[in-house]
């Protein structure tokens, strides 16, 4: 059951918005059962390493649901929340994958730097392409965001929608790139004594990145199917479709994620040379 509230604005025009959604059906039992089945399958077929990676996954989900989303709704700076999520997640994932070693520090540093650069570049590109970040899913719930009213009686926007879109894209890019970063650092650490350690590392990572993209790209592009159907249903022309704000924002998000995954290898290999080699040289001395 969707509860709809009806009101009038200052000009007397009637408007309606959904205020809450009630469901007479209890689904939690089935969802809990599916969670248990999923955990059992991970334990059986992914083994110890799979169970170990459930720790950061559960931590991250808890941070996003219990901390990030409520804080965003209350008006907390979205970029600060993004930084906190990426920082905590990178520490947890890198330490679990690489241990408490110099390699982990390198991987954490690379992930933080790449996320910062990602945000700056995406903001810049959006400004050049006149994209506001209003994606389909953001448009769907914007009506439910209650604006704040300050002491002067003026309405303030409760959330920066553009920043929200970039934060979502940055989180997706981070989780797509962090396995690539950790694996690149691990491989470079094994090859650092060779003459062409960086080149050898990049060459060995090419197949891994290709497999990663084959998995990620089709999955991401399926997300734009509802938006594309919406434009087709509204009989938009080809020019209107390719210039659509809703579709364009999603495509830009996907392409930036792909770029992050691809660039994670050379950036990680070069950062690994600067830091791992220094630690290696210090041990020799």
Regions found by a protein language model. Give the residues of each.
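Transmembrane alpha-helical segments that form the functional core of multipass membrane systems
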Residues: 36-40, 46-179
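Hydrophobic alpha-helical transmembrane segments of membrane transport and translocation systems
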Residues: 221-285
């Amino acid at each position: 059951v969707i509860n709809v509230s009806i009101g009038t604005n200052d000009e007397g025009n009637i408007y309606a918005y959904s205020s809450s959604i009630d469901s007479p059906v209890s689904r939690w039992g089935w969802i809990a059962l599916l969670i248990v089945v999923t955990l059992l399958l991970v334990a059986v077929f992914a083994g110890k390493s799979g169970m170990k990676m459930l720790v950061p996954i559960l931590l991250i989900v808890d941070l996003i649901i219990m901390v990030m989303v409520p804080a965003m709704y209350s008006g907390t700076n979205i970029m600060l929340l993004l930084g906190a999520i990426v920082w905590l997640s990178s520490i947890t994932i890198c330490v679990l994958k690489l241990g408490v070693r110099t390699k982990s520090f390198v991987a954490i540093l690379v992930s933080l730097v790449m996320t910062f650069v990602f945000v700056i570049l995406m903001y810049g590109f959006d400004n050049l392409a006149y994209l506001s970040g209003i994606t389909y899913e953001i448009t769907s719930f914007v009506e439910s965001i209650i604006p704040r009213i300050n002491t002067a009686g003026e309405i303030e926007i409760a959330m920066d929608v553009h920043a929200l879109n970039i934060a979502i894209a940055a989180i997706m890019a981070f989780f797509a790139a962090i396995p690539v970063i950790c694996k690149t650092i691990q491989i470079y650490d094994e090859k650092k004594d060779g003459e062409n350690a960086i080149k050898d590392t990049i060459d060995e990572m090419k197949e891994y990145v290709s497999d990663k993209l084959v998995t990620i790209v089709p999955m991401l592009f399926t997300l734009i199917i509802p938006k594309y159907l919406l434009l087709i249903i509204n009989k938009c022309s080809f020019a209107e479709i390719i210039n659509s704000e809703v579709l364009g924002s999603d495509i830009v998000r996907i392409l930036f994620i792909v770029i992050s995954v691809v660039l994670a290898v050379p950036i990680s290999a070069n950062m690994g040379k600067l830091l791992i080699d220094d630690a290696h040289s210090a041990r020799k001395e």
